[in-house]
Amino acid sequence: MSFYLDLATRLCILAIAAVGLNLILGYGGMISFGHAAYLGLGAYAVGIPAHHWLYGGLDFLATTNGFVHILIAIAISGLFALLTGLICLKTKGVYFIMITMAFSQMAYYLFVSIEEYGGDDGLVINTRSEIPLINLDDPIQMFLVSFSSLIFFMWLVYLITKSNFGLILSGIKDNEARMVSLGYNVYFHKLIAFIFSGIICGFAGVLLGNFTTFISPEMIDWSRSGELMFMVILGGCLLYTSDAADDR
C-alpha cells in the first residue's frame, strides 16, 4: 500500500511541474530544457533553511516554516526565471532550447560546487516543512497535499488559458508575426508566461524536497528537464482547448 501511495505522491508532484512546463510548451510554443532548474531550486528552498535550522549558520535562513519555504521557492525560482527568460526569449528554435539547457547546467554545477550542501552527493533533509494542521511526515497527508496542489494548479492554468492573456499566448504560438503586427508585446507576454511557469515548477520542488527528504544537483540536471518534457508530450501539450481553437 505504501509503495503505491508513494508512487501516486511522486506522480502528483511531477505532474505539477509538467503543468507548469505545459504553460509555455503547449500554449506558448516554447521548448525549454531548463525547467528542472526551477524544480531543483524549489527543493533547495526546503533543504537549505532546514539544514541551517538543524546545524546552525545563516540564522536568517534557518527555519522549518513551510510557508517561508514556499515564499523562498517562489522568489528564487521566479527571479531565476526572470533572469534566464530575459536572455532566452531573445532567441528562438534550437538556440532557445540550448540556452535554457545551458542555464540549467549552470545551476547544476553551482550546487555541485557547494560542499556545505553536500555537493554532488546531495543533502539529506532531516526535517520536513512545518505547516499548521498538516503533518507532512504522514504519507497520506503528504499525498493529499500533493494531489490538492495539483488540482489547484490545473485549475489556475485553466483560468489563465481562458483569459485574454492565455488567448494572446496561444496566438503568439500560432502566428507570432501576426500578433506583433496587431500591436501585442510578444516578448512581454512570453516572459510573464515563462516566469509563472518557473514558479509553478518551484512550488513542485518544495513538495519534492519534502517528499524525498533529500536534495541533490541531480534534480537540476537537464535530463530531469527531458523527463518533464516527455510527460507533457505524452500527456498532451494542450491540456485545455482554448476558445480560439474551438472557433477554428
Feature roles, as predicted:
Residues 1-243, 248:
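Transmembrane alpha-helices and adjacent helix-loop boundaries
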